[in-house]
């Protein structure tokens, strides 16, 4: 089966290509009775939208969402919700020079080997443009989780390339284009990105996502554990090369006496588990960390081959994010929310 749908009860099927007429998704399984209009979804899409600062792609897409079905008089009906986002600023001619070559680090090679052909325009189906419908679906999940369980999902950037970003305040996160929780470091980030653009290169990032106010009990052992599903969908995001939960890889250097979160009558002491034990939520915040690789489309020439196997030099022109991690925070939030609503509904179905 093709891998375009996620979820068991709250299912999201994503469709479209970067330079096609439109992209979108169908959300099947949303409970009826949720007050919902386009503005609820648009607010999240605007956080991810391209062209909002000099540090991201200058492709100018309004990303205006259209609700085609599943909502009547401002309320979800329980039937499939179809969401459409039209592409209005595609420049396919920018990709004519790489239509027959494979960009190092990109999915050009693997899509061709799997399907026997590929759409080279903007990366086609493998483009990060396809995360917009994910954010749209995630907006619905966020709203339902907040209204029915008081769950809050939010994220921030904790590292840009070699620059670590110490956490200071959630209030700083929406006040800068990096989603950095530290206003004092923003000038350094801007200077770094300005030089990176002059170099024609790209860089990676680290994103943290936190879900608060979850009840204990969500998750379906053994194979649909909450943390397993989180890791699964996060690795489905463009450019994600690593996922850790709680202490993550830091647990390697910890002893059991340190890693295991002690329990008192007042609750857990620490959260090395990242809010999940045995694949089931503990009631503590669920904490997820993502490693985002550097963007593959850069102006620096690199060696590759064309579809005939002949050696070529590749240089990617056009408009690209020099750090895709800058816009990854709302995308990662959406993915976490989609996993959580699915598990909330599954828990309710089995355990009441």
UniProtKB/Swiss-Prot annotation:
Cofactor binding, note field: Reduced FMN (FMNH(2)).
Pathway(s) the chain acts in: Metabolic intermediate biosynthesis; chorismate biosynthesis; chorismate from D-erythrose 4-phosphate and phosphoenolpyruvate: step 7/7
Residues noted as binding NADP(+) in the record, renumbered to the chain: 48, 54
Keyword Flavoprotein listed: yes
Catalytic activity: 5-O-(1-carboxyvinyl)-3-phosphoshikimate = chorismate + phosphate
Pfam families recorded: Chorismate_synt
Family matches, as InterPro entries: Chorismate_synth (IPR000453), Chorismate_synth_AroC_sf (IPR035904), Chorismate_synthase_CS (IPR020541)
Gene Ontology CC entries for this record: cytosol
Keyword set, alphabetical order: Amino-acid biosynthesis, Aromatic amino acid biosynthesis, FAD, Flavoprotein, FMN, Lyase, NADP
Family: Belongs to the chorismate synthase family.
Oligomer and partners: Homotetramer.
Function noted in UniProt: This reaction introduces a second double bond into the aromatic ring system.
Protein name, entry field: Chorismate synthase
Lineage: Bacteria, Pseudomonadati, Pseudomonadota, Betaproteobacteria, Burkholderiales
């Amino acid at each position: 089966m093709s891998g375009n749908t996620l979820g068991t009860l709250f299912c999201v099927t994503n469709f479209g290509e970067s330079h096609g007429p439109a992209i979108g998704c169908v959300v099947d399984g949303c409970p009826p009775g949720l007050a919902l209009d386009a503005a609820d979804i648009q607010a999240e899409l605007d956080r991810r939208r391209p062209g909002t600062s000099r540090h991201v792609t200058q492709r100018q897409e309004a990303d205006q969402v259209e609700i085609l079905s599943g909502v009547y008089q401002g309320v979800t009906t329980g039937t499939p919700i179809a969401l459409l986002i039209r592409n209005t600023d595609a420049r396919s001619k920018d990709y004519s020079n790489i239509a027959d070559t494979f960009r190092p680090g990109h999915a050009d090679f693997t899509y061709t080997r799997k399907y026997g052909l590929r759409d080279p325009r903007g990366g086609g189906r493998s483009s990060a443009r396809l995360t917009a419908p994910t954010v749209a679906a995630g907006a619905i999940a966020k709203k339902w989780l907040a209204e029915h369980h008081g769950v809050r999902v939010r994220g921030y950037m904790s590292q840009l390339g070699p620059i670590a970003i110490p956490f200071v305040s959630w209030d700083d996160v929406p006040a800068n284009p990096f989603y950095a929780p530290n206003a004092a470091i923003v000038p350094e980030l801007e200077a770094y990105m300005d030089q990176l653009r002059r170099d024609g290169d790209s860089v990676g990032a680290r994103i943290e996502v936190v879900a608060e106010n979850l009840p204990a009990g969500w998750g379906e052992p053994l194979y649909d554990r909450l943390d397993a599903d989180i890791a699964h969908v996060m690795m489905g995001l463009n450019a994600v090369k690593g996922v850790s939960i709680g202490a993550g890889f830091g647990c390697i250097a910890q002893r059991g006496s340190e890693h295991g979160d002690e329990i008192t009558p007042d609750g857990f002491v620490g959260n090395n588990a990242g809010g999940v034990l045995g694949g089931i939520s503990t009631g503590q915040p669920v904490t997820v960390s993502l490693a985002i690789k550097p963007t593959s489309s850069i102006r620096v020439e690199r060696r590759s081959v064309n579809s005939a196997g002949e050696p070529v030099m590749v240089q990617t022109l056009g408009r690209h994010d020099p750090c895709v991690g800058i816009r990854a925070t709302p995308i990662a939030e959406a993915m976490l929310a989609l996993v959580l609503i699915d598990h909330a509904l599954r828990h309710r179905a089995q355990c009441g």
